[in-house]
């Protein structure tokens, strides 16, 4: 009756956030479930599992003033019949854990100041093997994999190393600023959710208050009550909410003034947004319908934060160092792009013939620059796709920065008849997809594929894949299944380089996953958005300045 599942918390005092598997609403009982093994020799918990659970206790202590003596805390190892272990708070170990947390933050701040080169130079398998473990697992699997990663980081040319270091620093700084907002303007960081006064958040449209729950439903079997419909009270005429469908948000109840640091949080995404109501889909639905949304409860909704973009950027930079030497030289401008002068068009595209021919004769990459209204997406992109498909073995990856632009690409494919002749698959989230194109999403496209071999064959047969750069970066394993002769990136001038480099560097077996790419955009229009100022993001390394 009083049990919450997957309740989340943010603790400013400890600098921690977390999600508890199971907890009583009065904080008296806390259970953390583990599907893996316990310490089987001593029939007790593993230390890292215990520390995780103890940090949750710390959050309840510092956020809600709970005493450890009044909390019953358990680790549940679900694969064992006697796996429910009662645990007790360990003050010294807790302080050591917070010290480690602060050390991690210190190093993240160093990375934002350019320490990656120094850290890479110091890396070795001995350094990483802190406990000096041995045995078959370490010797045959872990150490060789770590050594391969270290070699990739160290055995690169000075130019590749300079590129990696500068963009690693850039991403690290962006990650820090997206959390803290920096010393000059905290409102741009996630911490602005509690640093910024309520009236300023309301003026900026970054919080919705006074919400009441109208309905709770389940989106499917085993999901719990994860669809929450909220009534939005009448707002001032000049109020403009800074929320849109698909946004990650935090929902919480409050009594006097909303403050996410003092409440139990539920995280999810906006499924639908109207002036007087909104529907959220929670990441973790509640099994008890009445556990949230009592008659007297009012709620607030604020923006959530994710490290996904930064993590994708780091992975992309590592993919760049791991790429084929020829592709790295091309991306760094060490070698010029090649031309195929004898290539001819298969189709007739009227006044676009000259442009499409130039694009087809470009072997490595092609840049299409033009202001809005010149037909870059509606005509040029369509004709480039049609010409590419006229070659029987060509597969195409179509990308853009925003979901709205991807919707436009999907509309071009369907309205032109291309999709009817050559069905496409869209990579992405249903929440951020126009309803017309939901049937093309990956999960629905594979409904008729009960076996892994069926999925592989369907992926191999499908010649067009569409998605945002974020969606593809989240699913880089696509390139283990699929090789593309062509990638076309629309809105390219709005995309930060680290968001593209991993895709352009991807490998399929021992070859480039993408043979050729086309960048479409207008550098005079909307630029890529970064938290750093031009001075902070300036490139001073001569090796990089020499390649532009």
Sequence positions of predicted segments:
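Mg2+/Mn2+-dependent nuclease catalytic core
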Residues: 2-102
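Conserved helicase motor core of SF1/SF2 NTP-dependent helicases
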Residues: 390-394, 401-404, 456, 470-472, ...
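Conserved RecA-like ASCE P-loop NTPase motor core of nucleic-acid helicases/translocases
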Residues: 372-374, 379, 383-414, 424-427
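Pre-Walker A (Motif I) flank of P-loop NTPase domains
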Residues: 362-368, 393-395
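A helicase ATPase "motif cassette" and its flanking acidic/Ser/Thr-rich regulatory loops
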Residues: 92-245, 278-284, 317-318, 327
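Pre-ATPase regulatory/linker segments immediately N-terminal to the P-loop/RecA-like helicase/translocase core
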Residues: 76-82, 91-112, 237-357, 361, ...
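Conserved motor-coupling elements within RecA-like helicase/translocase cores
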Residues: 436-465
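Switch/connector loops and helix/strand junctions flanking conserved nucleotide-binding motifs
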Residues: 40-42, 82-87, 406-408, 433-438, ...
